[in-house]
């Protein structure tokens, strides 16, 4: 089941386990992470806990008591009723008062979906607690002690490495390299690396020496291990890599070095968190910016289907939400429970984030509307319409021209038929017309006879011819004006197309310039990293040289002391011999 959604409470607002410290006594440190390392045990002088309170707690918790408190295990008395259930009302009040510690402290609450923390009960932060080793002197042999404390002369270390196996493990499966890297003893680390010890050995929590060095923020040891080929993609029992711990510690230098040596920027831990999602979850804004520049996947999902944007909204981090929205992330993506980032913001009452999301949606809608109303498409439509008009006008002109000879032919045929019917001019037609009809061969004889007539023999008046010629002139003028208009429109289309081509060329040039800038930026970053590594190497060489000088001075002092002692012994012996004589 997916837990209810609410915003993560601030560290100051989280209630610590309400009176349980004083009443539980010594068990408080074992069960509650908030009490570990605080130095305030709240125990009396006897160091015992309040038995009466523990009895009431057992009776109310029932069967969950054995899971949660070591003092109840193996007692044989479960204090469970006949139903075998615990007091739900008591557990509800306990959860509400304890807040986020409830899921860490009580196994009965883990995975139940009834956490009062909302989404934050899902992730176990115990992987990032107590990064340094807890070391007891009696559990370590000579080599491991020397690696941990680092206050042993180099000669003695070399002798130890000859006599013992440098890859030997202690009870917690730690090698000398683990201990030296976790405690920042770079001289011991360098000596072990020069002797070619195993780099990727796992301790009892499946962590390598590189992971421990990153976790404990020992930068010098990290660089040494990476230079000698340590694997940065090995996952511990929580699924975290060295990059996860660098992001959690907000150590940009270590993150850069790990990525430079091939660390996977998209590796997921057991909670499904990539380094970017972990940075968002822990509200590490500077590291999130760095990972975005390194092109981390902004659409990666955790095990509950939540994106970086949804996690940022649930955390209530408006700055990270704004940073992600600048990268044009998908606002409408849903997690496994079917909720979006906006729904989480509304349910958590994050008004600033709601405004950011609504403004972003409005901008996206405006972009989509502007893309739909594309000027290129409008120009194409106008050019197509104009070409169709031109075609129609061209088709109409030959039709008019072809109709005129057909009308003339029909008239000539009618005249010939009338002549044949009435014989020799009964209607009183002019002689030249009948002679032309009889002398001509069919239609061809009539048409030239019409053309050769003089003005006095014409049947139609001059006004009709003038009107006909004026109509022809008007038609030609119209055609010329249409041709001029089409020519102007074509010129406009050509100019628009030229403008579009120029705009497209400018866009291409800008994109190319941006890509060149990005490449230059990447090259600069690589050169900067190489310079930083070179500077670190120089510092390491200087420290080595200084240490060698110190060792030489110490050896000289030891030899001088030995000589003085030998002289003193000789003098004492001579004095003894004299006294005996």
Swiss-Prot record:
Protein name: POTE ankyrin domain family member B3
Sorted UniProt keywords: ANK repeat, Coiled coil, Repeat
Biological source species: Homo sapiens (Human)
Pfam families, A to Z: Ank_2, CCDC144C
Family assignment from sequence similarity: Belongs to the POTE family.
Superkingdom, natural source: Eukaryota
Composition-biased stretches (Polar residues): 476-494
PANTHER family cross-referenced by the UniProt entry: ANKYRIN REPEAT DOMAIN 36-RELATED, POTE ANKYRIN DOMAIN FAMILY MEMBER D
PROSITE patterns: ANK_REP_REGION (PS50297), ANK_REPEAT (PS50088)
Extent of Basic and acidic residues compositional bias: 377-392, 401-412
Gene3D superfamilies named in the record: Ankyrin repeat-containing domain
Region (Disordered): 369-494
Gene (UniProt): POTEB3
ANK repeats: 172-201, 205-234, 238-267, 271-300, 304-333, 337-366
Coiled-coil stretches noted in the UniProt entry, renumbered to this chain: 489-577
Organism phylogeny: Eukaryota, Metazoa, Chordata, Craniata, Vertebrata
UniProt key word Ribonucleoprotein: no
């Amino acid at each position: 089941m997916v837990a209810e959604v609410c915003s993560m409470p601030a560290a100051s607002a989280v209630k610590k386990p309400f009176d349980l410290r004083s009443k539980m006594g010594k068990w408080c440190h074992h069960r509650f992470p908030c009490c570990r390392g605080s130095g305030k045990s709240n125990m009396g002088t006897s160091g015992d806990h309040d038995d009466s309170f523990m009895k009431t707690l057992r009776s109310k918790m029932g069967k969950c008591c054995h899971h949660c408190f070591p003092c109840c295990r193996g007692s044989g008395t479960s204090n469970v009723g006949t139903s075998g259930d615990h007091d739900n009302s008591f557990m509800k009040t306990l959860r509400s008062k304890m807040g986020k510690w409830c899921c860490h402290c009580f196994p009965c609450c883990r995975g139940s979906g009834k956490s009062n923390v909302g989404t934050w009960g899902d992730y176990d932060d115990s992987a990032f607690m107590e990064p340094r080793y807890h070391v007891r002197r009696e559990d370590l042999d000579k080599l491991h002690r020397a690696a941990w404390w680092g206050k042993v002369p180099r000669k003695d270390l070399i002798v130890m490495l000859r006599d013992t196996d440098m890859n030997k493990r202690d009870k917690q499966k730690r090698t000398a390299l683990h201990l030296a890297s976790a405690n920042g003893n770079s001289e011991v680390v360098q000596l072990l690396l020069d002797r070619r010890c195993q780099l990727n050995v796992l301790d009892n929590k499946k962590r390598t020496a590189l992971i421990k060095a990153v976790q404990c923020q020992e930068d010098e040891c990290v660089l040494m291990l990476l230079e000698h080929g340590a694997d940065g993609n090995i996952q511990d029992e929580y699924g975290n890599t060295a990059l996860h711990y660098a992001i959690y510690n907000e150590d940009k230098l270590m993150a850069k070095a790990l990525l430079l040596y091939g660390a996977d920027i998209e590796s997921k831990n057991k909670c499904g968190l990539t380094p970017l999602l972990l940075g968002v979850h822990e509200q590490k804004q500077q590291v999130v910016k760095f990972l975005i520049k390194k092109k981390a996947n902004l659409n990666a999902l955790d095990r509950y289907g939540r994106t970086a944007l949804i996690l940022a909204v649930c955390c209530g981090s408006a700055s990270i939400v704004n940073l992600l929205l600048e990268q044009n992330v998908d606002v409408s993506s849903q997690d496994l429970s079917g909720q979006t980032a906006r729904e989480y913001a509304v349910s958590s009452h994050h008004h600033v984030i709601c405004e950011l999301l609504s403004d972003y949606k409005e901008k996206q809608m405006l972009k989509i509307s502007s893309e739909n109303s594309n000027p290129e498409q409008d120009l194409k439509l106008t050019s197509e319409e104009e070409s169709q008009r031109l075609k129609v006008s061209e088709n109409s002109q030959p039709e008019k021209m072809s109709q005129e000879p057909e009308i003339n032919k029909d008239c000539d045929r009618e005249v010939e038929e009338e002549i044949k019917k009435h014989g020799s001019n009964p209607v009183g037609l002019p002689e030249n017309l009948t002679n032309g009809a009889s002398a001509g061969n069919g239609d061809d004889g009539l048409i030239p006879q019409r053309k050769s007539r003089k003005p006095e023999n014409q049947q139609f008046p001059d006004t009709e011819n003038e009107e006909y010629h004026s109509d022809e002139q008007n038609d030609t003028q119209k055609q010329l004006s249409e041709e001029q208009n089409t020519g102007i429109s074509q010129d406009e289309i050509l100019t628009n197309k030229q403008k579009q081509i120029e705009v497209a060329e400018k866009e291409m040039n800008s994109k190319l310039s941006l890509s060149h800038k990005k490449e230059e930026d990447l090259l600069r970053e690589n050169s900067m990293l190489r310079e930083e590594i070179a500077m670190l190497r120089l510092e390491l060489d200087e420290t080595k040289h200084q240490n060698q000088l110190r060792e030489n001075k110490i050896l000289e002092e030891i030899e001088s002391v030995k000589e003085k002692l030998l002289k003193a012994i000789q003098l004492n012996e001579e004095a003894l011999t004299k006294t005996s004589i």
